[in-house]
Amino acid sequence: SYSTGRTNTAKDWESLVTDLNVCSQRGLVQRFDSTIGGATVLMPFSGRTQQTPVQAMAAKIPMINATTSTASVMAWGFNPAVSEQSPYHGAVCAVVESIAKVVAAGGDSEKCWLTFQEYFERTQGKAERWGKPFSALLGAYKAQLEMECGAIGGKDSMSGTFEDIDVPPTLVSFAVSTAKAEDIISAEFKCPLSK
């Protein structure tokens, strides 16, 4: 895991760029066919050489015997380092990050809905172990109120313990919205000197 301190040494940079959370996902992405159904608006990698990872999924809404220009836009948010330190703040960040990615890709935050995937250690009858999922749900609830974006579903698991090994507190937020397909924004630089 990389340092979250304010130092800026070569060791810190090496630790950051070798962390699994920032490594390339290309091998995993290539195991899935992103063109199924022919409705893909945003491929997993964009740019002239298809090297820039996208922040969101965008695909036209499936239609029977018709066409549409409306696309669904979906993105996720989760930071394991923050969530391990504070499940509350991790959940707040997850909600904000998922919505921000949707908006960055061209989705509308006012037409955005959320769903959560939660995964926590077994409580094993210990009251203090309930604090992690409780604080994560409070954080997610606070973020929903502040962002004016509600969760319409989710999936939870409290079985993240094997012998004496516990999963880190996990609340992944998925944000979903719509946009016109022609308004979807990919992540790569569009021209020289882009910022």
Set out the residue ranges of the language-model regions.
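Glycine/proline-enriched, intrinsically flexible loops and inter-domain linkers
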Residues: 1-195
